[in-house]
């Protein structure tokens, strides 16, 4: 496989609508037929490079490789030479030893540099601009929750801060025809991927709403996320920014009172800061599909690995 022919998952920008739909269908197939893929990664290794903290991404990728007969290698950025060397050169070496690489980095630009050096498929396990694997599991969860309803009839409402998860949600929903409404009181320009937004606007799948009641009244799903990036949440140097954000965003909390105005089910990509963007009562309540959503990361990761190595 030459470098020019290697397929990566950095964002949905490099995937066609039909490729995204095919990947979604395949992820659902893998979940329903896990035993059929028990040995597909035999003799193969996945390098997992972490610059950001993780629970779900590490667990799901490592378990995915184990269940498929392969091996997941955990690499801590600070304990590796990625922190010392040119990223593309380290990636060029690493890709000579493994079949696929997953990287969870702070800067999207670093992931692009890593892609330029990798001779094997590179998966974005989350960066500051995109989180494609999360959005695949999100839509997989919706498709499994309402299999009788075509995706282009689904209304998804996101309430929170415009971030990497939102960019990936915009990309995948526009590809699949899902209507996405954003209620994003905080939407800083540097966090918005304009190409992704413009494509969705052109397709008519994306809209914005300031009235919270109007945004949720016809929603099938209400989705929220942390109001401050996880690596900064407990950082004392961000205390003032955190305080300002919490005060601004508290009226947009997902709570029982808000849910009285909608029949929507509730989603969150985790980790959760209960009492801020969502109450613990809602997280554990009957409308929550948050843990199904998190569980589906496992089969979504399997599907991504298998598809990229098949390409």
Curated annotation (Swiss-Prot):
A GO cellular component annotation in the UniProt record: cytoplasm
One Pfam family here: OTCace
PROSITE patterns, per the entry: CARBAMOYLTRANSFERASE
Residues binding carbamoyl phosphate: 54-58, 81, 104, 131-134, 268-271, 279, 297
Keywords: Amino-acid biosynthesis, Arginine biosynthesis, Cytoplasm, Transferase
Record-listed E.C. numbers: 2.1.3.3
Name by which UniProt lists this protein: Ornithine carbamoyltransferase
Species the sequence originates in: Leptospira interrogans serogroup Icterohaemorrhagiae serovar Lai (strain 56601)
Lineage: Bacteria, Pseudomonadati, Spirochaetota, Spirochaetia, Leptospirales
Underlying gene: argF
């Amino acid at each position: 496989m030459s470098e020019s022919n290697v397929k990566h998952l950095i964002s949905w920008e490099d995937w066609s609508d039909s490729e995204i739909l095919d990947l979604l269908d395949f992820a659902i197939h893998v979940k329903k037929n896990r035993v059929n893929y028990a040995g597909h990664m035999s003799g193969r290794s996945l390098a997992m490079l972490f610059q950001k903290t993780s629970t779900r991404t590490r667990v799901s990728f490592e378990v995915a490789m184990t269940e498929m007969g392969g091996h997941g290698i955990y690499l801590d950025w600070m304990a590796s030479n990625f922190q010392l060397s040119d990223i593309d050169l380290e990636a060029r070496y690493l890709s000579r030893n493994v079949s696929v690489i997953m990287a969870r980095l702070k800067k999207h630009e670093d992931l692009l540099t890593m892609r330029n050096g990798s001779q094997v498929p590179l998966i974005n396990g989350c960066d500051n601009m995109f989180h494609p694997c999360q959005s695949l599991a999100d839509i997989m969860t919706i498709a499994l929750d309402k299999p009788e309803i075509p995706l282009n009839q689904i209304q998804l409402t996101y309430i929170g801060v415009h971030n990497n998860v939102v960019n990936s949600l915009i990309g995948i929903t526009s590809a699949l025809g899902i209507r996405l409404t954003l209620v994003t009181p905080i939407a800083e320009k540097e966090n918005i991927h304009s190409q992704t937004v413009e494509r969705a606007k052109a397709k008519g799948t994306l809209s914005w709403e300031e009235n919270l009641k109007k945004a949720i009244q016809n929603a099938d799903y209400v989705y929220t996320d942390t109001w401050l990036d996880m690596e900064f949440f407990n950082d004392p140097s961000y205390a003032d920014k955190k305080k300002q954000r919490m005060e601004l965003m508290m009226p947009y909390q997902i709570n029982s009172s808000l849910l009285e105005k909608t029949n929507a089910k509730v989603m969150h990509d985790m980790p959760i800061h209960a009492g801020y963007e969502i109450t613990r009562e809602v997280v554990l309540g009957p409308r929550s599909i948050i843990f199904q959503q998190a569980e589906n990361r496992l089969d979504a990761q399997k599907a991504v690995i298998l598809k990229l190595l098949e390409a």
